[in-house]
Amino acid sequence: MNQHDEQANPGAVPRRGGTGGDAVNARGGRANHAAEMPGDFVAGPGAGHERVEPVARTREEPEMIERVLLDGSVTPMQIHRPKGKPRAIVVFFPGFGMGARYYWPMAQELRDRGFAVLVSELHGQGGQTARATRGHQWGYHEIASVDYPAAVAAARKEFQEPGERLPLYLMCHSMGGQIGSLYLARPEADVDGMITIGSGTPHYIRFTGREYTRLCWGGPVMWTVSTILGYWPAGPWDLARYGRQSGRHVREWAMFARNGRLRPTQADIDYSREMLKVTTPVLMLTCDGDRDCTPDSAMDLASRLPAAARFEFIDRRLGHNRWAREPEAVADRFELWLEELSVGGARPPR
């Protein structure tokens, strides 16, 4: 099976995803052109348990652009243009093991609300052409310092008129938010804010039950396999369904899960120290039913950005991935957050 064939049914709700990974499948390449939305969900505690009808949607093929990165790999990027002048730009990054096309309902929802949206890929996932081998590895640092700046620059080029600067916000899922937190600490970061959904630290002490066991014991297994092979393999042994992944990235994640410290290899800055200085507003969300990013996990990641990040819980049972296919609740909170920013009320408490 080659790198472009490892595609699960993108119309289905994923079996699992998480702070430890976000598996629909590592190759999110091809989607049904008219996929129905998943069924009804039951509102979470405190919401009256009312029946909520998801909005019926039909996927519209987006415009696509490509960017060649420093390693020669190519990143395809979805372009969703609103009618009229954009309110702002949103650059979206997926979770670990998830292709960008899974998120089309969220992209279209934001577009319909007047936002210009670019949806990128994480390195080596979805339509991104990098292939992890023993001799070709990347990690958190490479993605934060290469992939994220490339996507932001592409979005500004696509959506801005010459001499114009529109507000630009990152929207990141799970692993995408971990990496986004590093990007904000970099000197070239060029965004006005970041909202994350289901992003937290994978430190096993932030979890209970099956997830505690999976992270406590599964992390060392993934570290060992990725060290021996030089990459994390796809196929029958990929029980987590992350798809083929860079060995360096998996090892960095596994140590993060083990000791709560993220220390990217070959980094050109001290990310932990620089994150303490970030003041770009960050809103970190988790949804009811998300066992793979607990509130404690998200708050732990938010604490790494003490001058920038605040955490909130969405009391609707949208889990770790379902919010992306039923995007109204997150889109509503995003719009409200932008209103709060405009009046200076969205900063973390002092």
Language model features: what each stretch is:
Residues 314-350:
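Catalytic active-site module of serine/aspartate enzymes centered on a nucleophile-bearing elbow/loop
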